[in-house]
Amino acid sequence: MNYLVMISLALLLMTGVESVRDGYIVDSKNCVYHCVPPCDGLCKKNGAKSGSCGFLIPSGLACWCVALPDNVPIKDPSYKCHSR
């Protein structure tokens, strides 16, 4: 009986759960992607369920992704965009 519990626990830990979140998708410099090309394609290409154009102060129009995987960076308001 104990073996069954241990095996079940091990399988549960090995499968892992991939979590998702919503947010403004960014590049490696914490700069948002603007709405051209259309956001839905960009977001889906990066594993999100969907994407749309939203307004982010002070960046302006930016791509908002729904259900984006954790390994894809989203806008961190505590860091500025470091372009160029």
Swiss-Prot record:
A Gene Ontology term for the protein's cellular component: extracellular region
Pfam families, per database record: Toxin_3
Localization terms from the record: Secreted
Top-level taxonomic group: Eukaryota
GO molecular function: sodium channel inhibitor activity; toxin activity
Signal peptide: 1-19
Record's keyword annotation contains Heme: no
GO biological process: defense response
Chief place of localization: secreted
Keywords: Disulfide bond, Ion channel impairing toxin, Neurotoxin, Secreted, Signal, Toxin, Voltage-gated sodium channel impairing toxin
Tissue: Expressed by the venom gland.
LCN-type CS-alpha/beta domain location: 21-82
Comment on protein domains: Has the structural arrangement of an alpha-helix connected to antiparallel beta-sheets by disulfide bonds (CS-alpha/beta).
Function: Alpha toxins bind voltage-independently at site-3 of sodium channels (Nav) and inhibit the inactivation of the activated channels, thereby blocking neuronal transmission.
Name recorded for this polypeptide: Alpha-mammal toxin Aah3
Organism annotation: Androctonus australis (Sahara scorpion)
